[in-house]
Regions:
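Extracytoplasmic cysteine-anchoring/structural motifs
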Residues: 22-433
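Sec-dependent bacterial lipoprotein signal peptides
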Residues: 1-21
Length: 433
C-alpha cells in the first residue's frame, strides 16, 4: 500500500455579500394607494472564488468565476404571522417598470464573459455597488433572495427560468431545474449543469436569517447577503492514464485486455432539480441514472499517443492551462443528490457507489469505483451535496498534482480516493492507498 499526502488550501465558496442600508423617503408622492412607500437600498454586491466548468475547462482550484446574471427577488411575510405556524414568505413582484417586466431586480455590473474575473484580477473577489428603490408595504417582513447564474450569453440554457407566482410561491418551495432539452441531451451524452448560487439576508454578526420589517417609521437597516452554491463541483485531474486495462463489466464471461479510446467519470444517480433555499433536491425531483459527467477523448485527434514501453497515454503539457505532461482535467457541476438515488456499479462487484471511472474502446468496458477518503460512513455510496467540491487530483497556484492512474491501477479493482472539499477555505490531506 502506498500513501501520498498532498496538502493544499482550497477556496471554492461562491459568496455574495450585500451590505444593505435602507431609508424610507418622506416624500408623500413616494407612497402608493396600498400604502407601499419607496425604500432606498444601497448594496455592495461581491462574488468571491468559485470553479468553472462545461466548455470552459477548469484550470485551477483558485478563485475563478464567470457570473453574468445576478438577480434579486423579493419575498414577504405578514408581520402578524411572523413566528407562528402560518409564517411563510411568498413572492412579491416588483412594481417598478423595468423590474416588473422581469419579476426581479438585475445587478447589471455582473457581466462576465471571458476571462474569468478573479483569475484575471489577482484572485480578488468581484464587488459592485448597487442601489434600488423598491416600493415596500408597511406591516410586512421582507426577505431578499439573490440568484446568480453564468448562462446569460448561452444560446441553449440548461437551467429553467424560475416560475414564481405572486403571493403564492413560498421561499421554501422556490426551485430551479434542468430544462427538458438538457435532460434529453444528457441521456445521449454528457450532463452539463451551469454555475448556480443563492442566498438571503443575514445578520452581519450572527449570520442568522434577518428579514426586514417595514413600517411607516422604517428609516434604515443594515444586513449582509451571503450566497453559496446550489450545485456541487466536480474536478477530475489525472495523469499517466493506462494504455491497457482489463475488462470487468458485470456479466463478462472472460477478462479482455484492451486499449481504451475514452475515459469518463460517471455518477450512478443525479437529480435534475434543486430547491433554491434549502440547496437540496425536492422529494419529487426527477433523477438520471448512470450519467456521464465528463469524458476524456484518448484518441490521437485529442493529442494523445500510446507509449508502448511505459504502457500509458502520452500528451504534451498544456502550458496555457497549466496541465502537466500526460495529464488532463475535466470538470462539471452537479445538482445535489441524496444517497438513496445512487445505483449499483456496472462492474463485476456490483456494489452500490456514487461515482466510478469508465474506460471503454466502444466494445469492452472497465468500471473502477471511486471512493472518498473518510473515517466514517460508506466510502463508496454517499450523497452529492451542494456547495461541496468532489475532486481527484490537486491543482492550485501552489500545487499541481494530477492523480496518477498508472501508479495506482490494480487489474482487479481500483479504489480511487475522492476528496470532498467543503465550501470554505480549509487545509486537507489527500490520501491515496
Amino acid at each position: 500500500m502506498k500513501r501520498i499526502s498532498i496538502k493544499n488550501s482550497l477556496n471554492i465558496i461562491l459568496a455574495t455579500s450585500l451590505l444593505v442600508s435602507c431609508s424610507a423617503s418622506n416624500d408623500t408622492t413616494d407612497t402608493l394607494a396600498d400604502g407601499s412607500h419607496a425604500v432606498k437600498l444601497e448594496m455592495r454586491v461581491g462574488v468571491s472564488a468559485g470553479v468553472v466548468t462545461d466548455s470552459r475547462e477548469l484550470d485551477t482550484w483558485d478563485g475563478a468565476q464567470q457570473v453574468n446574471d445576478m438577480r434579486i427577488y423579493v419575498f414577504r411575510c405578514p408581520a402578524e404571522k411572523k413566528g407562528t405556524s402560518e409564517e411563510a414568505y411568498t413572492y412579491c413582484a416588483p412594481v417598478e417598470t423595468e423590474a416588473a417586466k422581469k419579476g426581479y431586480y438585475t445587478v447589471d455590473a455582473f457581466d462576465n464573459r471571458e476571462p474569468y474575473y478573479s483569475a484575471e484580477h489577482q484572485n480578488m473577489p468581484e464587488q459592485h455597488s448597487y442601489t434600488i428603490e423598491p416600493y415596500l408595504q408597511n406591516g410586512y417582513y421582507y426577505q431578499f433572495l439573490a440568484i446568480g447564474r453564468d448562462d446569460k450569453y448561452v444560446t441553449n440554457k440548461v437551467l429553467t427560468e424560475p416560475k414564481f407566482t405572486e403571493n403564492v410561491t413560498k421561499l421554501e418551495d422556490a426551485r430551479i431545474a434542468l430544462t427538458e432539452q438538457a435532460k434529453n441531451s444528457a441521456k445521449l451524452g454528457i450532463l452539463n449543469t451551469t454555475e448556480l448560487f443563492s442566498g438571503i439576508l443575514q445578520d452581519e454578526k450572527t449570520h442568522e436569517e434577518a428579514p426586514v420589517l417595514v413600517t411607516e417609521e422604517t428609516k434604515y437597516f443594515h444586513r449582509t447577503l451571503t450566497a453559496s452554491r446550489n450545485v456541487a463541483g466536480l474536478m477530475i485531474y489525472v495523469e499517466n492514464i493506462p494504455a491497457q486495462v482489463e475488462s470487468n463489466a458485470a456479466g463478462d464471461v472472460s477478462t479482455v485486455t484492451f486499449t481504451p479510446t475514452s475515459l469518463s467519470v460517471v455518477a450512478t444517480g443525479i437529480t435534475t432539480e434543486t430547491l433554491i433555499r434549502q440547496k437540496q433536491a425536492p422529494a419529487d425531483a426527477d433523477s438520471l441514472t448512470y450519467q456521464t459527467l465528463g469524458t476524456i477523448d484518448l484518441t490521437p485527434s485529442n493529442g494523445w499517443t500510446v507509449d508502448a514501453t511505459e504502457n500509458i497515454f502520452k500528451r504534451a503539457e498544456d502550458s496555457q492551462k497549466g496541465w502537466k505532461e500526460n495529464s488532463y482535467m475535466i470538470s462539471n457541476f452537479m445538482m445535489p443528490t441524496p444517497e438513496g438515488k445512487m445505483q449499483k456499479s456496472k462492474n463485476s462487484a456490483e456494489n452500490e457507489t456514487t461515482f466510478y471511472l469508465h474506460y471503454t474502446d466502444g466494445t469492452h468496458h472497465r468500471y473502477d469505483n471511486i471512493r472518498k477518503s473518510t473515517t466514517t460512513g460508506d466510502k463508496f455510496k454517499f450523497p452529492i451535496e451542494a456547495n461541496h467540491l468532489y475532486c481527484l487530483g490537486a491543482k492550485s497556484k501552489t500545487v499541481n498534482q494530477p492523480y496518477d492512474l498508472k501508479e495506482y491501477y490494480e487489474p482487479v479493482m481500483t479504489d480511487v480516493n475522492i476528496e470532498i472539499e467543503p465550501a470554505f477555505e480549509k487545509r486537507h490531506d489527500f490520501i491515496t492507498e
